Structure formats: structure tokens, C-alpha cells
Amino acid sequence: MSSTSLAWPRTAKSSLLQSADFSSTSKGYDRLGRRAREKLLDREFFLSLLNSASTKREAKSYLARLKAQHSPKPQVKEPEKESKDDAPQPLPSGVNLGSFYGASRSVYDSPVFRHDSTPTPHREISEERLHLSLVKLTTPQLLDDYIIDGVAKTLSQLNRLGMASCVVVDPGAGDHPNALRKIAAEQADRLSNAIDALPDSKSAHLDSVLSLSSTDPDTPTVMSRKALLSPMRDGHIVVVAPIAYTDDVRAVVVPADNAVLALTKELAGLATRPDPDEDPWVTAQRIGDLQREVSLDRVILLDPLGGIPAFSGPQTSHVFINMEQEFDDIEQELLRVRESAASSNQPSASSLLDGDASSIADSNPISKFVNHDVVPVPPEQEAVLPGLRLEERAVDGHLENLSLSQKVLAMLPSASSGIITSPLEVANSAMAPQTTPSGLAVGTRRQRNPLIHNLLTDKPLLSSSLPLSRRAAINGRRGSLTAPSSHTTFVKRGMPLTLVPNPRVQTWTAQNRPRMSLDDPSIDLPRLVHLIEDSFNRKLDVQDYLNRIHDRLAGLIIAGEYEGGAILTWELPPGVEDDGSPASEARMVPYLDKFAVLKRSQGAGGVADIVFNAMVRSCFPNGVCWRSRKDNPVNKWYFERSEGTWKLADTNWTMFWTTPNLPDDLQRFQDYEAVCRSIQPSWADDTGVVD
């Protein structure tokens, strides 16, 4: 959403930009009165908020959720402990009767023997649930001050939006533990100072969070849950160095990934060790109380490498990763690239940085990515991993980020998500737009902040099913000549994806039709019917539909537990006989017959993207067509993902396709149109409404 869509007067908009830029420096901020400070803080905050949301509706929706989270809870009337008849009558005051009247304390304190166990009352959690993000900032010692300041500013804005943050500073690997410990402590102080320098922002650098046991010296644990959570409840951004203390009070540097895993385990309520003598119900109740106390909603990895790159297909990076479906494939892809980088005869990292990289750019698939997107390694860091070249270290970094995200999300609820991006991208989006001496903004706008955008929408900056050709205009700065591509990766534990038949075993072609039907035992037909009816909000004539697609089924895509899906068929244009001949098979049209997502899963979780990507990348990579009502509100989503569209004259249909260069093949185009015109719907209500 561009700033011009707010329809502000030019003077008001330039004033807002000027004030936002002025308020970003504490020096100018200190010269203002209290009321002026509050106004400037609010202006900058809401400007960033509106820039980071795709639509006004998303921003308003989040603000409504935020208000609901912090609304006062209704007071619950406590039940009377004793009935009126049983309660002791009050004695007249002014006369000390001692213990003569009424029961003595010894009676009240005497134990009561019961045959049954005394029920344990449920302990209500007095404090409201704390929503937080766990952040890992990799090698901050390599980052300029303005990047650290931009990261601090974004964390402060997240805090104001109701998302507390705990940041783990990662100094990287090295052979000198004492030097690493010093770097970690210095960088934690550096980030903490940057946060404290911001108006109305507070940090807490905790240096005694983790401990190491002699029985398990490789796995750190959290010393005190209360010491970790209390500062965040008070509005502080917690900064932690990956330093743990042993039983003999020695400070030891631990891998930052291990620190993140230990914090995740504690915040997820999974660090409690059950007592074998404790009632399992009591143990479950205790763990449940811990989990209701805190909600770890986001795991954010800020790494100079940025998001996870892609080396197969047209995309250059993974915008969204469904871990259940894609983790193994992406891991294997990165391992193959690393093996290629290790086996190729590459010069050293220093020679790459001196300008010799262009000669080998074509010989290694990661070279181009490294040359343009990795923060240069200073000479003093060159010997950190002397046995690895720059490309190998880059791939190793991506593998570590991918693995850490997978391990962390496996401990969290499915609603939690992860973000992998670069500190530079976060810092650039946190900077106010440049202004001219006259006070007018230059023809660029703020980049959408990937962290704030994700908090508002629970979606990636770009849809993963969006074609590469359409990403630049949406991702880049409107009005600029060049639109930088986003390397932010949004990660979800996600859901499994079922493709029937499996295209890796049997390709989806007209010659290899599976000759199956929807009442096949491998398909849960009642759940599939519920999915279709819930998505379309109409009753399906099941038998009529089964008859229509009989012997035409190309395959089925099911996301999760029938949360989304697609039914694809092979259709013949009217007048073409299905006689099994090569000529007949050549005329068959790949057709998307049903595309459905449960109402509760629409607009969130990326279910539609997961199904659509499977269809166009795995099942029908050479193209598929479908139709939709001309007034269907989903058409905007279809327009952005199709290669072309065609409004069918004298009908209420619009035809979409992903087949490259379809209009150049007149016969093929006419077959597509004939199929989209001729298919009859199979709805039980028979209202006459097409679709």
C-alpha cells in the first residue's frame, strides 16, 4: 500500500515525514516538550504501521486484535466459601472473649482425614498472556551502527505493537573462547545501548540466563524463568549473550543455536522435568499453566545472509517454506550446492572480495548470490573457519538457519512462525524516507518492514505462489527504477501435502491418466465433500459430480487434514471423441476443476499458496487452465498468478491459464476456451448461479 493511498494533503504528508525523520534521533527528540514528543512518536509509529501493512484493513484488523488482547478481563465473582447457615455469627466488638466462644485455632488447623483425595483447585494465572518473539542476531560485530540502530528501532516498534522480544547475540564461531565471550558481551551492550537511545524504549541485558550441567555439558538450560520474563512484562527488550555458567561458576560460550533452543524450550513450557512420583494430571496442569503464561509467536533469525536461496526453478529465494512438505527437499538442494562449491576449484574468499569473482560466477550456482548478498568478511574474521571458502560458509549458514527453524517450530504450536531475513533489510525499512531541503519526500517510499508486516498479517512480504515476473513491482519501492528483490523467508511448521498420484512416481500426463475416481479408498470422500461445500458455501450434488469426472480425473492435491485441496481433470473439447488415440490425447486440456480452502484457513497459513504451488510446479508445470465468475472476489488473486486471462463472451466466465505462450497456439487456445464454456456445474441447490 503506497502512502498516496491515504489521500493526505501534500503539506500534511510532508509534515508527517519530516516529523517522523526528526523523531528518529534522540538529539532532536530531547528538544521537544512532552506533548510534542508523544505526538511525534505516534505519527512515526503509525506511519511505519501503515507502510508495513499491505492494506488498511490488515492494519485495522491487527489494531483490533491488539485492543482485544489488552482489554480488561471481566471480574469473576468469587463463590461464597461458606453458606449463610454454616458461617459463624460475628460476635459483638469491644469485649475480649478469648477462645471461649467459637472454635479455637487448633481445631481449624487440625488435619482432616478423607477417604478420597482432596481436589486441587485450578490456579488462575493473574497476569495476561505475554506474546513474544525470540530473535537471533548473527555476527553483529560485522554490522554498521546504522544497521544496529535500525534493528533496535524495529524491535522497539514490535514491542509497542504488543510483541515483546528476547534477542540472542551470535558472535559466530572461532578458536578463541575468551575472545568470543568478549565480542558477545560487547555486542549485547551495543544493541542494548541502541535500544535505550530510542525514545520510550528500554532494554535489559541479562548476563546470567543460561547454565550448564556437568551431566549434560552440551545442552544449556534457563536458570530462572522469572528473571527472564519479568523484564519483558515491564516493557523491556531483553538482550542475551550466548554465555552459560557451569556448576563451578565458570562462564562458557555456547553455540547461539543451542541458546535459542534452550530459550525456546523454556518459553514453550517444555523445560519442566516431570517428577515420577507426581500425579500425571498435576504435571500436565503445571505445564499447561506455563504454556498459558507465554505465547512464543515468532522466531526471527537476522543473518547477513538473508533468507534461504533457491537454486531450482525460476525463483531466486524461498519466500515461504512449509516445513512439513519442503524441509527435506530444500536441505538436499543446499547440500548439493555445498558439495558443488567444495569440489569446484575456487579461489580463496579474499580473492573473491578483491574482484576475481566474476570469472567464476557461472561455474558455481551460489557465487552470484554470495557476491551480491553476503556482507563482506573483514580480514580479522577471515581465519574464523580457514578450511572453508566463502561459498561453503554461506551455504553452511543457510543450512544452519533452516535446521534451527525446523527444530524450534517443532516445539511450538502450529500457529507460531519463523522469519529469516537480513539485518540490512530490516534496517533499511526502518529508516525514514529521504527528504529534500524543501521538506518534500523524494519519489520513494519506505520499504515494508518484513518483521512488522509479518506481525500484522502472519504472511510473508510476497506470496510464494506469485510468479517471479510480478514480484518486483510488489516488493520494490514504487517509483524507483530498480526494485530490489526480497530475500526474506517466512517459515511455518505447516502441514503435509498429499498428491494423488505422486508426480515423482507417475507424471501427470494425458497418456498416464490414473483411471481412478474420488471414491477410491485412498481418498476420504466425505471430508473432501465437506471441504468443497465449506469453501464454496454451496451443497454439492455428489453423485452427479462423480459421474461428470468419471474417467477424467488427473489427480488430487490435499493440504493437511483436508484444510485445502484441488481436483484436476483431463477434459476434451466438445466434438472430440475419447478413443484413446494419440490424436485424442493430444487435444486433452489440463483443467483445474475445484480449488477449495476451508473458511477457517482462508487468508492465513498459506494454504492456498501451498496448493497452488504444488499444482503449477509439481503436477502441471507445463500449464493448466480454469474458469471463474467474472465478479468473483478471488479473481484478483487469480490474475496475479496466471499467465493470461480471457473473458468468455456471452457468459459470466473468465478463463485463466498458466500455460506459456498459449495465444500463439490457436488450436490449443480454442480447445481451452471450448472446455471452459462447456463444463456443467454439479451443485445440488440448482439456483442457476454459475460456479
UniProtKB/Swiss-Prot annotation:
Highest taxon in the source lineage: Eukaryota
Catalytic activity, reaction form: L-glutamate + acetyl-CoA = N-acetyl-L-glutamate + CoA + H(+)
Enzyme Commission code(s) on record: 2.3.1.1
Keywords for this protein: Acyltransferase, Amino-acid biosynthesis, Mitochondrion, Transferase, Transit peptide
Top EC class for this record: transferase
Subcellular location: Mitochondrion
GO cellular component, one term: mitochondrial matrix
Region (Disordered): 1-29, 65-95
Pathway where it operates: Amino-acid biosynthesis; L-arginine biosynthesis; N(2)-acetyl-L-ornithine from L-glutamate: step 1/4
Any single GO BP term: L-arginine biosynthetic process
One Pfam family named in its UniProt record: NAT
Protein purpose: N-acetylglutamate synthase involved in arginine biosynthesis.
Annotated family: Belongs to the acetyltransferase family.
PANTHER family cross-referenced by the UniProt entry: AMINO-ACID ACETYLTRANSFERASE, MITOCHONDRIAL, N-ACETYLGLUTAMATE SYNTHASE
Name under which the protein is recorded: Amino-acid acetyltransferase, mitochondrial
Lineage summary: Eukaryota, Fungi, Dikarya, Ascomycota, Pezizomycotina
